[in-house]
């Protein structure tokens, strides 16, 4: 995800300062006192990239994009989980490129403790996250250092490309296409968590999977400028607080908590339970309820009900007088948020593709 505006970088980093604070009451004071520090932090990060890579070359991790810098920001890895493309590039020598290829191919799925804004290699894992999603030049899965080293050597010798930056520097890079069904491979990694949450909260597995695909494309490192974290993109200070309250816990989930795949799937699914059983309770038709839940997961239950009426009870009454097709049409055309309108379409389509997953 290439970003050209410094403001978006600030939006990406601010929430992590917020998420690291367990005391929301003190957040505004802390933020006010540390404005200068925040400016230094965001300014330093963007300045590092601008000075090294030049303007309009800033890459930042997002919901469906893994981005990691290393080698003092001279080398970076980018995985587009939506497009199924891995690009690893360097302004240093090919030895640094080789190392980055190996570390990227063998990175694990545990995002806890990984600072995506710092420079440094992601640790090599004995259970690489990309196994099954990428194959080498012999069509083999890349499961260990030896296989990864050999593939990295092959890529550099046979697939190395170059491009010139606006600042005159030359980038050396390789691109690796993921296999055609990489999304389904990732989805299956999380089926045990999905099935457990489905049983516990009575939420259809296909709905959980459809939301996960739409929110993160099953990227365990997923983050967003809105401070949504992890596979189901749970926002700690809003949905996260509601979830903890439901579980009888105070405060909100931490960044580390939400980067745990099992806990994230549980949190996202429990929020769907809250939407169905509390915030949207009273909607009678199961299909209409599903449409409302999906839209509310993105924009909030209040925003969904206001599409039909400013009075929540009247909104539910109106929904109950409609056919599900009418509810769907109104939510996908009448919701004031274009993102919410598109979200329902995307999740509904994705959910249909998972109804036969076993």
From Swiss-Prot:
Coiled coil: none annotated. Residues 1-19 form the signal peptide. It is found in: Cell outer membrane. GO terms for cellular component: cell outer membrane. GO terms for molecular function: hydrolase activity, acting on glycosyl bonds; peptidoglycan lytic transglycosylase activity. The keyword Signal applies. CDD domains: LT_MltC_MltE. It is a lipid-anchor. A lipid is attached at residue 20 (S-diacylglycerol cysteine). Gene3D superfamilies: 1.10.530.10. Belongs to the transglycosylase Slt family. PANTHER family: MEMBRANE-BOUND LYTIC MUREIN TRANSGLYCOSYLASE C, SOLUBLE LYTIC MUREIN TRANSGLYCOSYLASE-RELATED. This is Membrane-bound lytic murein transglycosylase C. The lineage of its organism: Bacteria, Pseudomonadati, Pseudomonadota, Gammaproteobacteria, Pasteurellales.
């Amino acid at each position: 995800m290439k970003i050209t505006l410094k403001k978006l970088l600030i939006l990406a980093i601010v929430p992590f300062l917020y998420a690291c604070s367990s005391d929301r009451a003190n957040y505004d004071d802390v933020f006010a006192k540390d404005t200068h520090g925040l400016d230094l932090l965001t300014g330093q990060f963007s300045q590092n990239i601008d000075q090294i890579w030049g303007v309009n070359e800033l890459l930042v991790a997002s919901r469906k994009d893994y981005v990691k810098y290393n080698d003092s920001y001279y080398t970076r890895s980018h995985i587009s989980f939506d497009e199924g493309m891995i690009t690893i590039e360097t302004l240093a020598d090919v030895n640094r490129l080789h190392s980055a290829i190996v570390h990227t191919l063998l990175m694990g799925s545990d995002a806890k403790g990984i600072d995506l804004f710092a420079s440094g290699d992601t640790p090599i894992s004995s259970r690489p996250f990309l196994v099954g999603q990428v194959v080498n030049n012999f069509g083999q899965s890349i499961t260990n250092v030896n296989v990864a080293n050999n593939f990295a050597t092959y890529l550099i010798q046979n697939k190395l490309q170059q491009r010139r930056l606006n600042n005159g520097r030359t980038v050396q890079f390789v691109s690796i296409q993921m296999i055609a069904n990489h999304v389904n491979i990732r989805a299956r990694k999380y089926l045990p968590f999905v099935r457990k949450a489905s049983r516990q909260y009575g939420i259809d597995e296909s709905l959980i999977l459809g939301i996960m695909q739409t929110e993160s494309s099953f990227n365990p490192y997923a983050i967003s400028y809105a401070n949504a974290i992890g596979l189901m993109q749970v926002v700690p200070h809003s949905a996260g607080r509601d979830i903890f309250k439901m579980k009888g816990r105070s405060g909100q989930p931490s960044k580390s908590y939400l980067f745990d795949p099992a806990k994230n799937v549980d949190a996202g699914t429990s929020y769907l339970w809250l939407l169905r059983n509390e915030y949207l309770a009273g909607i009678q038709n199961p299909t209409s309820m599903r449409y409302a839940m999906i839209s509310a997961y993105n924009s909030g239950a209040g925003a969904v009900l206001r599409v039909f009426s400013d009075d929540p009870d009247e909104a539910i009454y109106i929904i109950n007088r409609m056919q599900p097709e009418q509810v769907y049409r109104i939510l996908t055309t009448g919701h004031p948020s274009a993102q919410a309108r598109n979200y329902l379409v995307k999740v509904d389509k994705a959910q249909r593709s998972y109804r036969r997953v076993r």
